[in-house]
A protein has these predicted regions:
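A fold-level detector for beta-propeller and closely related beta-sheet-rich head/sensor domains
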Residues: 1-200
């Protein structure tokens, strides 16, 4: 980048939606010495699309047991998916008013990519997704960042053996996005201590 603070001041606030797109576009642009102009995303109240496109990745739920015992208003506790915004999104169910709320978006930024398909890793390619012309022409094509398969599993509980807690795990591959796989401990209770882990 032309300015060393672009990652911190422009790209990460854009990716994490912690900054306003209009402010980022106006403040951190080619005209002010930054490497690119940033894309404005839809902000109307009727448009709730806060995730990248989900292609080939599953949307799965886990946690809370197979019966109504441990479920949250009849739902599994966690909902997970991966998207081409370069993130694995983890949602947690709390109540009926908001069935699932986004709790964490994990970016496997160091995963290596084929250099002919964008940046050398996921972190570098995020900048392309933020470009104002992303997906609009051959110079700024759509990028696959995470579109591999994902699987969720829950550990067994065995009170008699002293295993007092269950944990939920996610395993995924990068698909066309990069070479690699990842595993996340989503949440649950420690196997020995019974203390909350992950999103719990």
């Amino acid at each position: 980048t032309k300015k060393k603070d672009e990652w911190k001041n422009a790209l990460m606030p854009w990716v994490t939606r912690s900054g306003q797109d209009n402010t980022i576009k106006d403040t951190y642009s080619e005209a002010t010495g930054y490497s690119q102009n940033y894309r404005l995303r839809e902000t109307s109240p009727s448009d709730k699309r806060n995730l990248g496109d989900i292609i080939d990745s599953s949307v799965l739920t886990v946690g809370g047991g197979q019966t109504t015992d441990g479920l949250v208003d009849g739902r599994n506790e966690f909902l997970v998916t991966a998207a081409n915004d370069g993130m694995v999104h983890l949602f947690q169910s709390k109540n009926d008013t908001h069935p699932y709320s986004l709790k964490l978006s994990y970016i496997p930024g160091g995963m290596e990519r084929d250099a002919s398909y964008g940046g050398k890793n996921i972190a570098e390619t995020l900048k392309e997704v933020a470009h104002e012309k992303y997906g609009r022409d051959a110079s700024h094509p759509h990028r696959y960042l995470i579109n591999g398969g994902i699987v969720v599993r829950r550990t067994a509980e065995d009170v008699e053996a002293g295993i007092i807690g269950q944990q939920s795990f996610l395993f995924g591959t990068m698909g066309q996005g990069a070479r690699g796989a990842y595993a996340l401990n989503i949440g649950g209770k420690g196997r020995i201590t019974g203390k909350a882990v992950g999103l719990n």
